[in-house]
């Protein structure tokens, strides 16, 4: 589990497992892994999930994204949400991009 000793996911905990996370991402055609949401801004609690933003290789599908989520949840022992980097410039997409920090 990614934790600081209290069961709270942290950016530092994720970065300690960076190589493992990037290896899993690459298996599913994902790169440029970034963290956003409560973990990125330091507001996570014991019930928080991990929100990741990724770039997917051309030709990859929702099945690749689903496989990535399942493999990361198994490795990290916590619910993980993964979004592909939005191509459109909506207000929500811009907020996520601003908040996202490199793994």
Protein language model regions, located:
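Catalytic core of pol beta-like nucleotidyltransferases
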Residues: 1-32, 40-46, 57-103
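Conserved histidines in hydrophobic membrane contexts and catalytic metal-binding motifs
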Residues: 35
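Structural signature of FAD isoalloxazine-binding scaffolds in flavoprotein oxidoreductases
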Residues: 54
């Amino acid at each position: 589990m990614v934790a600081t000793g209290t069961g709270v996911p942290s950016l530092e905990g994720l970065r300690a497992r960076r190589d493992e996370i990037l290896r899993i991402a690459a298996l599913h055609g994902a790169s440029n892994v970034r963290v956003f949401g409560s973990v990125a801004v330091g507001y996570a609690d014991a019930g928080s999930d991990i929100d990741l933003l990724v770039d997917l290789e051309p030709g990859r599908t929702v099945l690749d994204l689903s496989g990535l989520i399942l493999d990361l949840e198994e490795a990290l022992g916590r619910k993980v949400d993964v979004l592909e980097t939005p191509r459109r410039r909506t207000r929500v997409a811009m907020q996520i991009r601003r908040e996202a920090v490199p793994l």
